[in-house]
Amino acid sequence: MVTIRLARGGAKKRPFYQVVVTDSRNARDGRFIERVGFFNPIATGQAEALRLDLDRIEHWLGLGATVSDRVSSLIKDAKKAA
């Protein structure tokens, strides 16, 4: 099953997440199909905290992809800000 979820990156104690489309059987930070955005939970000042390609996300949702709980709330926030 294809899912849209977060893949963790960044350094220890400084998380940075890629929003990726992947097969649900793959490891969290493993192989993915497409990168559709990023989320920086510790962004401060002028740093961009969230960027999502909503067109590609809608495309994958139309093909039947599921969305993790956290990514679902991020999509909601991005749509509200747009």
From Swiss-Prot:
A GO biological process held by the record: translation
Assigned GO CC terms: cytoplasm; small ribosomal subunit
Keyword Transmembrane: no
One Pfam family hit: Ribosomal_S16
Gene3D superfamilies according to UniProt: 3.30.1320.10
UniProt key word Ribonucleoprotein: yes
Listed HAMAP family: Ribosomal_bS16
Membership in a protein family: Belongs to the bacterial ribosomal protein bS16 family.
Annotated protein name in UniProt: Small ribosomal subunit protein bS16
Annotated source species: Pectobacterium atrosepticum (strain SCRI 1043 / ATCC BAA-672)
Gene designation per UniProt: rpsP
